[in-house]
Design a protein with these regions (language model features):
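Autoinhibitory propeptides
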Residues: 1-15
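Subtilisin-like serine protease catalytic core
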Residues: 14-25, 32-44, 52-100
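Functionally constrained cores in energy, signaling, and assembly domains
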Residues: 2-6, 28, 70
Length: 100
């Protein structure tokens, strides 16, 4: 992720205060697993496959995609407390539609 963020110049956006705050992204994929890196930013989950009510991901792909987009990096801290990884827009909110 760090390499990708360098290639697409995320540092420029971050310096301008652009980090996903007040932005909502729809992820249409295999779902999303509740995770501390999404720290209550999943606004809505809709399951079009099995009609379950609670957020889940029975494949992992949707959670991976959501992490790339907006994982906070909270769970990637090293022993010193230094955050190692985060998504491109770590403050974004999610609407997740399980379609696969």
């Amino acid at each position: 992720m760090d390499r990708v963020k360098r290639v697409i110049h995320c540092d420029r956006a971050y310096k301008m205060g652009l980090n996903g705050k007040n932005i909502t992204v729809a992820v249409m994929d295999t779902g999303i697993a509740p995770h501390l890196d999404f720290d209550q930013r999943i606004l809505h989950f809709e399951d079009f496959c099995q009609k379950k009510l609670a957020a889940y991901d029975d494949n992992g792909h949707g959670t991976h995609v959501a992490g790339i987009i907006g994982g906070s990096g909270l769970m990637s801290k090293d022993k010193r407390g230094v955050q190692l990884l985060s998504g491109v827009a770590p403050r974004v909110r999610f609407v997740v539609l399980k379609v696969l």
